Amino acid sequence: MSSNMPASLANGRYQLGQLVGRGGMAEVRVALDTRLGRTVAIKIMRADLANDKIFLSRFRREAHSVAQMNNPNIVNIYDSGEETVMTDSGGTERLPYLVMEFVKGQTLRDVIKANGPLSQRDAEQVMLGVLNALEYSHHMGIV
């Protein structure tokens, strides 16, 4: 990720907060949407991948696809954009981002780490949510 991560995106609309997750393609930060006064999650693509047309296309396709969905088991996408930041060497980097619903809570990994294996009933509830989202995604032509 850029060593020059801005404090905000979209001309100050989204004030970036703490890092909440990192994956192979992007990192996710909690942020404040100053226009609507709500907490959001912002997925920011790794700067080194933003110039790769395949990764950038995949990132944009994800935003468009998920924005069309309306399911309680799939996070909502509110906005997307791209920021240009200065690098330490004086160049610029592109930072494409997605603004998403912030879902407060723990990851399944953290729950299992803290409490041990799920009971059969809890595992079934988790799987029902996942399967519901998968079925809906399939119905929408995503998978």
Where are these regions (language model features)?
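Protein kinase catalytic-loop region centered on the HRD/HxD motif
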Residues: 130-142
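AlphaC helix of the eukaryotic protein kinase fold
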Residues: 46-68
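Protein kinase glycine-rich loop
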Residues: 16-23, 28
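Conserved N-lobe loop of protein kinases adjacent to the ATP-binding glycine-rich P-loop
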Residues: 30-39
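Activation segment signature within eukaryotic-like protein kinase domains
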Residues: 126-127
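Conserved short submotifs of the Hanks-type protein kinase catalytic core
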Residues: 86-107, 111
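Flexible N-lobe loop architecture of eukaryotic-like protein kinase catalytic domains
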Residues: 21, 61, 69-73
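Activation-segment/catalytic-loop signature of the eukaryotic protein kinase fold
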Residues: 80-81
